[in-house]
């Protein structure tokens, strides 16, 4: 456990806080920018969730009952839903939001290394989001799926400008992520307070550091692929057109070389949050700290060399199938290290169960289910049957929708008092957890059965044999959307009626630097660097 000298310098009153819109529009303060990221992520999450409710209403019953057989609109809904949730909800919340706000606090830095770069990193997201939403109203919208596979995304499949606008949106959000990653890496390496070595950093900071490297390595590959697609569509190149000597499979390789690390870009900050939460509410240091760091690094590395498990059905060679099957299964080893280390941390601990701990334990259970179905899908022979069925939809939602989302809620409830100065009512938080837990499981668990029965994804109609589980899934989606609006209600209720939050509402289990500061922290923190002593 770390202790501090010169604590009296941490909460200074000489703040010089800017007023009005200038504080937010022109902000270079890492805490304000982190808050803007989190607010943006909540808004985008509600919008993306409403998109999903629309196509779940279509899927509630067979026969084109809601969208009136407008299959292009259905494809646009699933495309925009996925892009919003990945690029505008989970990443801005976990990596950019909590990362911006808490990394400097956790390492004792006065701010981020490049404050103005931090500002533009956020404001790039706004035009990116507007471009994506506007693309849905252009020439029928981008009905390609979030993967943008040619030839469907080429001029053969989409003659209008919708796909081009969506590509520009992805360019901007990718640039935002890369700039933010550079900022966080420089901050973590150069601005740690005296006495805080790399292996004294909290695991959340480690998770952000590994994620930032993944973004810098993966995002340019996506940018290159969609730029090549853009030139195919507009400038006569044939990168992905067989009639000009190109190959649409090249796009799949490029996309998934980004796309699989993206899965870990989404979940690794969540791993860090869960480590903080479980350690705090078990009143114990995390079990196997160095092993947890090593597991994150290995997950990040191996995540780059197994991309083609998304492509088992495209005609890969036998040797490639063997390699990608084995490599994918190997990822379960470092992930298992993390799961068992969290359980070992709780073992023998003095555990309490406030809302953040409930979401963290819920994450472990649901992410483990998603991991087990991932091992099943890693088998290339089984994947021949299950590829592009609802079994895959269930798998990746158990890791992302029920995994990363639960870590975001855990982090939000854990740190909301610190950010706002108001502590949420515990009973409301626990009700939110149980509504969400029931809703998302009702939504996605039946999809395993649908996938095993052979129901294909991305198809808006289906035989009546699948109607029962689809209705259950759609009811679950409605409950989940209700939970999202209930969460927004909790936020506003807490801001208006919540009790003032103390510097450390969680007790002696919360021993990281941010809990030494007032709630909310001063506008400028650590103007005199704290010194960490063991």
From Swiss-Prot:
One of its GO terms (cellular component) is respiratory chain complex IV. Keywords: Cell membrane, Copper, Electron transport, Heme, Iron, Membrane, Metal-binding, Respiratory chain, Translocase, Transmembrane, Transmembrane helix, Transport. Coiled coil: none annotated. Its main location: membrane. Its EC number is 7.1.1.9. The keyword Membrane applies. Cu cation binds at residues 260, 264, 309-310. The chain crosses the membrane at residues 35-55, 76-96, 97-117, 120-140, 165-185, 202-222, 254-274, 286-306, 320-340, 357-377, 396-416, 433-453, 475-495. Fe(II)-heme a binds at residues 81, 397. Belongs to the heme-copper respiratory oxidase family. PANTHER family: CYTOCHROME C OXIDASE SUBUNIT 1 (PTHR10422:SF18). This is Probable cytochrome c oxidase subunit 1. It comes from Rickettsia prowazekii (strain Madrid E). The lineage of its organism: Bacteria, Pseudomonadati, Pseudomonadota, Alphaproteobacteria, Rickettsiales.
């Amino acid at each position: 456990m770390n202790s501090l000298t010169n604590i009296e310098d941490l909460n200074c009153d000489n703040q010089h806080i800017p007023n009005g819109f200038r504080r937010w529009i022109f902000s270079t303060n890492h805490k304000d920018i982190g808050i803007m990221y989190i607010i943006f992520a909540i808004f985008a999450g509600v919008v993306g969730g409403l998109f999903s409710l629309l196509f779940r209403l279509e899927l509630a019953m067979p026969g084109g009952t809601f969208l009136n057989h407008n299959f292009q609109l259905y494809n646009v809904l699933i495309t925009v839903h996925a892009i919003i949730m990945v690029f505008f909800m989970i990443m801005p919340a976990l990596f950019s939001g909590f990362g911006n706000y808490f990394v400097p606090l956790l390492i004792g830095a006065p701010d981020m290394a490049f404050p103005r770069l931090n500002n533009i990193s956020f404001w790039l997201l706004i035009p990116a989001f507007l471009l994506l939403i506007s693309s849905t109203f252009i020439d029928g919208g981008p009905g390609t799926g979030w993967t943008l596979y040619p030839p469907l995304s080429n001029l053969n499949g989409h003659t209008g400008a919708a796909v081009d606008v969506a590509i520009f949106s992805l360019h901007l959000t990718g640039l935002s992520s890369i700039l933010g990653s550079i900022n966080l890496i420089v901050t973590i390496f150069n601005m740690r307070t005296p006495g805080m070595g790399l292996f004294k950093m909290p695991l959340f900071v480690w998770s952000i550091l590994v994620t930032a490297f993944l973004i810098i390595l993966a995002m340019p590959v996506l940018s290159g692929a969609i730029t090549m697609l853009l030139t195919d569509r507009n400038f006569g190149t044939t990168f992905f057109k067989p009639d000009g000597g190109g190959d649409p499979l090249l796009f799949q390789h490029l996309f998934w070389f980004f796309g699989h690390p993206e899965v870990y870009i989404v979940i690794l900050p969540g791993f860090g949050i869960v480590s903080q939460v479980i350690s705090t509410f078990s009143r114990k240091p995390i079990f196997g700290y160095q092993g947890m760091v090593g597991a994150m690094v290995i997950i990040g590395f191996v995540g780059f060399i197994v991309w083609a498990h998304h492509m088992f059905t495209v005609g890969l060679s036998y040797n490639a199938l063997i390699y990608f099957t084995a490599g994918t299964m190997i990822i379960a080893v470092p992930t298992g290290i993390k799961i068992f280390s969290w359980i070992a941390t709780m073992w023998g601990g003095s555990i309490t169960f406030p809302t953040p701990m409930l979401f963290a334990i819920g994450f472990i259970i649901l992410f483990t289910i998603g991991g087990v179905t991932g091992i099943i899908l890693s088998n290339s022979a089984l994947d021949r049957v299950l590829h592009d069925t609802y079994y895959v939809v269930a798998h990746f939602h158990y890791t992302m929708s029920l995994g990363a989302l639960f870590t975001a809620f855990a982090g939000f409830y854990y740190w909301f008092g610190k950010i706002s100065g108001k502590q949420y009512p515990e009973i409301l938080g626990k009700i939110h957890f149980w509504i969400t837990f029931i809703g998302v499981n009702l939504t996605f668990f039946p999809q395993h059965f649908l996938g095993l029965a052979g129901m294909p994804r991305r198809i808006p109609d289906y035989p009546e044999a699948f109607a029962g589980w689809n209705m259950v899934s759609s009811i679950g989606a409605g409950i989940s959307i209700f939970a999202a609006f209930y969460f927004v209600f909790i936020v506003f209720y807490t801001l208006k009626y919540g009790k003032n939050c103390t510097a450390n509402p969680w007790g002696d289990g919360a021993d990281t630097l941010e809990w030494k500061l007032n709630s909310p922290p001063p506008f400028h923190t650590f103007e005199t660097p704290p010194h960490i002593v063991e």
